[in-house]
Design a protein with these regions (language model features):
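C-terminal cap of thioredoxin/glutaredoxin-like
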Residues: 3, 8, 12-13, 17-34, ...
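Structural alpha/beta surface segment adjacent to cysteine/selenocysteine redox centers
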Residues: 23-128, 133
Length: 223
C-alpha cells in the first residue's frame, strides 16, 4: 500500500503594491506547477504601508528606487514594471484596502483570490493605478468575475480590516520584517526575492530530496 505524505506547507507573506512580490509570484508560479500537490501554499497579507497616510517625498523616492532596482532583474515581468504608481498624482496611502480586497476574494476560493491579486498587481505595478481606492477595487473585482454582493460585504467588513492588522502583528512576532517572505515547512524563512533555483533547493531540502541548502542572506531557521 502506498504511503501518503502530508503536503509541505509554504506560507508566502506579500503586499500587492510590492514590485519584489510581483516578481517572486512569477517565479513561484513555476514551482506551483512543478511540485503540484506535494506543496500546500498559503498566501498571507503583510502590508508595507500599514497606516493611512500619504507617503512623504522621501518615502516616495525610496519606493521609486525599489521599483527601479526590481526593473533590473532578468525576469520578463521586470521590464513591465513602472514607477508611475508612486510618481503620479494619486499614490496609495495604505496597503490595507487592497489586501482586504484579496481576503474578501479568498472567501470565493483560492483561484478567485489569485485572479484578483494578479489583476491588482498588473494595474498597480505596470499601469500605475492606485488599487487601494474603493472604486478601483470594485472595478477589478467585477472584471475577474467575482460575485459582487458577497465580495462587497466581506470587503467592507471591519472584521476583514482587523484580520489584516492581526496578520501583520502575528507575522512580525514570527520575525517577518518585509516582503516577499517565505516560510517553508515551518523550518526556513527566506526574506526578499530569491532566484528560482534557491527556492527550489530549499523546498527539496524540506521534502527530504536533497541535503541542507547553501546559506544565503536573510535566511534563518524559524523558531
Amino acid at each position: 500500500m502506498k504511503t501518503l505524505h502530508k503536503p509541505l506547507q509554504i506560507t508566502v507573506y506579500q503586499d500587492v503594491l510590492c514590485a519584489w512580490c510581483y516578481l517572486a509570484d512569477q517565479r513561484l508560479d513555476v514551482l506551483r506547477q512543478e511540485f503540484g500537490e506535494a506543496i500546500r501554499w498559503s498566501v498571507r497579507p503583510y502590508p508595507l504601508r500599514l497606516h493611512d497616510a500619504l507617503p512623504t517625498e522621501r518615502e516616495k523616492r525610496g519606493l521609486v528606487e525599489e521599483v527601479q532596482r526590481a526593473q533590473r532583474e532578468q525576469d520578463p515581468a521586470a521590464r513591465l514594471l513602472s514607477t508611475d504608481l508612486w510618481l503620479g498624482g494619486d499614490p496609495p496611502r495604505t496597503s490595507v484596502p487592497a489586501l482586504a480586497a484579496l481576503e474578501a476574494a479568498r472567501l470565493q476560493g483560492p483561484q478567485a483570490r489569485a485572479f484578483l491579486a494578479r489583476s491588482m498587481q498588473r494595474a498597480a505595478l505596470e499601469q500605475g493605478i492606485n488599487v487601494s481606492r474603493t472604486d478601483v477595487v470594485f472595478e477589478l473585482a467585477s472584471r475577474v468575475g467575482l460575485a459582487m454582493n458577497e465580495f462587497s460585504a466581506a470587503f467592507r467588513s471591519e472584521e476583514t480590516r482587523r484580520l489584516i492588522l492581526d496578520e501583520h502583528r502575528d507575522a512580525a512576532n514570527r520575525g517577518v520584517r518585509g516582503v516577499p517572505t517565505l516560510v517553508i515547512g515551518g523550518r526556513w524563512m527566506l526574506c526578499g526575492l530569491r532566484e528560482l533555483s534557491e527556492y527550489r533547493e530549499h523546498i527539496l531540502t524540506c521534502l527530504g530530496k536533497v541535503a541542507t541548502p547553501r546559506s544565503g542572506s536573510s535566511e534563518r531557521l524559524v523558531h
